């Protein structure tokens, strides 16, 4: 069987199983009483399982360029497709400034730390510790918003954080409304996760073979082909929410997806397997991700959202990224 046919079949199986996994995870989360923010974070992790698995597979095989570029290339695609294309289709994505600072601040912290790991300025293990130092409290606040009152922070800061979480929760509550699941949903989720992992491994292997036969570089295989294909479901969902005025949902989906990619798909395996010396393609992908994220958040904060022009800028930025890694 040709690598192209194997790749296409693996992609279809991966995406189909991912959709099934996400819906069942949502139902299980509803049964367990997850907050809307935690449910969104959990489903983002489930939705990211293809790119995370592909990245881990590549790093385990010693294909650093593919492993790094799948994760960070997917993040560049998310910014362009979820935020950029979403703003173009919807006309405008309105965003609460507190949500931009709260969620965006965590994303900038993780992106900067990931950049430090890619460039070997910070070791993977140290980078992982730095990211977890911020991500654990963020996840805890998503799960138990009331815990902020017991952290000993000033009352004014407590009120601000609670307001940011409330702004995010208010939109997520209307966007995420799964029925309460049972043991059958949990069983289906476990089976779907296994299928996603196996199909993603096949997808990464076949993409590498296909790219080699076509003369593509490893960064094109990982940062453009695998990254774009595995992120398509997130893009479709984000465009839907953007067109229905759920701006905070789009921002949370894009940034939480990116955060989990860096954490689970890059830093955790890098801390275990090591990274070696940075290569020029790795640096191009990493700098494009950090730069486009900074542009997106800055424009969103100043304009209290993203209009069509901002969306075009992000999409053009992705086009420049594709050209840069392809030459």
Where are these regions (language model features)?
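Hydrophobic alpha-helical segments, chiefly the membrane-spanning helices
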Residues: 1-327
């Amino acid at each position: 069987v040709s690598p192209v046919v194997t790749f296409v079949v693996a992609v279809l199986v991966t995406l189909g199983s991912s959709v099934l996994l996400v819906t069942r995870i949502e139902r299980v989360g509803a049964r367990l009483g997850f907050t809307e923010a935690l449910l969104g974070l959990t489903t983002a992790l489930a939705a990211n399982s293809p790119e995370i698995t592909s990245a881990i597979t590549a790093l385990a095989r010693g294909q650093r360029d593919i492993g790094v570029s799948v994760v960070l290339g997917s993040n560049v695609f998310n910014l362009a497709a979820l935020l950029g294309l979403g703003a173009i289709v919807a006309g405008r994505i309105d965003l609460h400034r507190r949500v931009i600072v709260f969620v965006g601040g965590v994303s900038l912290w993780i992106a900067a730390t990931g950049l430090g790991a890619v460039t070997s300025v910070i070791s993977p293990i140290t980078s992982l510790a730095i990211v977890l130092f911020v991500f654990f409290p963020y996840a805890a606040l998503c799960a138990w918003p009331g815990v902020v009152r017991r952290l000993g922070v000033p009352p004014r800061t407590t009120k601000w954080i609670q307001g940011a979480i409330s702004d995010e929760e208010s939109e997520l509550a209307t966007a995420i409304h799964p029925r309460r699941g049972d043991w059958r949903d949990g069983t289906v989720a476990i089976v779907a996760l296994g299928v996603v992992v196996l199909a993603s491994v096949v997808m990464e292997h076949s993409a590498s073979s296909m790219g080699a036969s076509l003369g593509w570089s490893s960064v094109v295989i990982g940062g453009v082909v695998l990254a774009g294909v595995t992120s398509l479901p997130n893009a479709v969902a984000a465009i839907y929410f953007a067109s229905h005025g759920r701006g905070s949902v789009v921002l949370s989906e894009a940034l939480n997806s990116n955060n989990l990619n860096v954490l689970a798909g890059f830093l955790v395996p890098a801390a275990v397997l090591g990274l070696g010396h940075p290569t020029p393609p790795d640096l191009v992908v990493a700098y494009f991700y950090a730069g486009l994220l900074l542009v997106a958040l800055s424009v969103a904060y100043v304009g209290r959202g993203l209009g069509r022009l901002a969306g075009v800028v992000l999409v053009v930025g992705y086009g420049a990224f594709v050209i840069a890694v392809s030459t």
